[in-house]
Curated annotation (Swiss-Prot):
It is found in: Mitochondrion matrix. Homodimer. PANTHER family: ACYL-COENZYME A THIOESTERASE THEM5. Its main location: mitochondrion. One of its GO terms (biological process) is cardiolipin acyl-chain remodeling. The keyword Metal-binding does not apply. Gene3D superfamilies: Hotdog Thioesterase. InterPro entries: HotDog_dom_sf, Thioestr_dom. The gene is THEM5. The keyword Zinc does not apply. GO terms for molecular function: long-chain fatty acyl-CoA hydrolase activity. It comes from the Eukaryota. This is Acyl-coenzyme A thioesterase THEM5.
Length: 247
C-alpha cells in the first residue's frame, strides 16, 4: 500500500508539474480540494448539523479524570481556539463528497464499515477517546481510556491498543494540519504499562512538513504528567483528496 501511495503521489506530481510548480502545503489555509479557505476545509470534517452519531461524547463508562479533563478542554474551545473533533464510525463519514486520489480508491459492497478504533460497540469495553485540535499551533490532545477488551498483560492495556490510538490521533492531526493521508512510518518507545480503564493523555504535534511528508511526535502520559507511558514519532504522506463525481 505504501509503495502504491508513492506511485500515485509521483504520478500526480508529474502531471501537476506540467502545469505548475509542485505545491507543498506548509500552512493550513491554501486552496485545495476542500476549497479556498480553512473554514471550507473544517466544514467538511466538522459538520454543524448531522444525523451521524458522535462517539467522542461522554458516557457512563468514562472515569472521573477523563470527564473532568474533557470539561477543561471544552472550556478551551470557547476561548483558546481549540476544536473538539467529532468521531464517526467510519472515515467515509468525515470526508463525504470527497474520495481518495485516483489509483487508490477501491470499491466495496460492505455497508457497515468501521474505523478500527470504533469497532467495539460496547461502551467502556474498547477505545474510549476524544481528540481536541488546535489549528493555529497544529497540535492535538487525545484523551484515551482503554477498556477491558483491550487488555494485554492482566489488568493492563495491550501495547497495540496504544499504538492504534497514537496512529489515529496522528492521522486526524496530519489530515487537518496539512492534508496528511497515509501513515508511512510509526515508531514507539514504550515506557510504562497502562492500567485498563485509566486515563491516558496524548500530546501530538506537527514538527514539520517537508518533501510532501508530515513529521509528527507524541508523548502519552498520565494526567499529572508524572508517568510517561510512551513516546512516538510518525511520518505521513501528504496527498489531496478529490471531489466525488455526481451520481
Amino acid at each position: 500500500m505504501i509503495r502504491r501511495c508513492f506511485q500515485v503521489a509521483a504520478r500526480l506530481g508529474h502531471h501537476r508539474g506540467l502545469l505548475e510548480a509542485p505545491r507543498i502545503l506548509p500552512r493550513l489555509n491554501p486552496a485545495s480540494a476542500f476549497g479556498s479557505s480553512t473554514d471550507s476545509m473544517f466544514s467538511r470534517f466538522l459538520p454543524e448539523k448531522t444525523d451521524l452519531k458522535d462517539y467522542a461524547l461522554p458516557n457512563a463508562s468514562w472515569c472521573s479524570d477523563m470527564l473532568s479533563l474533557y470539561q477543561e478542554f471544552l472550556e478551551k474551545t470557547k476561548s483558546s481556539g481549540w476544536i473538539k473533533l467529532p468521531s464517526f464510525k467510519s472515515n467515509r463519514d468525515h470526508i463525504r463528497g470527497l474520495k481518495l486520489p485516483s489509483g487508490l480508491a477501491v470499491s466495496s459492497d460492505k455497508g457497515d464499515c468501521r474505523i478500527f478504533t470504533r469497532c467495539i460497540q460496547v461502551e467502556g469495553q474498547g477505545f474510549e477517546y476524544v481528540i481536541f485540535f488546535q489549528p493555529t499551533q497544529k497540535k492535538s490532545v487525545c484523551l484515551f481510556q482503554p477498556g477491558s477488551y483491550l487488555e494485554g498483560p492482566p489488568g493492563f492495556a495491550h501495547g497495540g491498543s496504544l499504538a492504534a490510538m497514537m496512529d489515529e490521533t496522528f492521522s486526524k492531526t496530519a489530515f487537518l494540519a496539512g492534508e496528511g493521508l497515509f501513515t508511512l512510518s510509526l515508531n514507539i518507545r514504550f515506557k510504562n504499562l497502562i492500567p485498563v480503564d485509566s486515563l491516558v493523555v496524548m500530546d501530538v504535534e506537527l514538527d514539520k512538513i517537508e518533501d510532501q511528508k508530515l513529521y509528527m511526535s507524541c508523548i502519552a502520559h498520565s494526567r499529572d504528567q508524572q508517568t510517561v507511558y510512551a513516546k512516538s514519532s510518525g511520518v505521513f504522506l501528504q496527498l489531496q483528496l478529490e471531489e466525488e463525481s455526481p451520481q
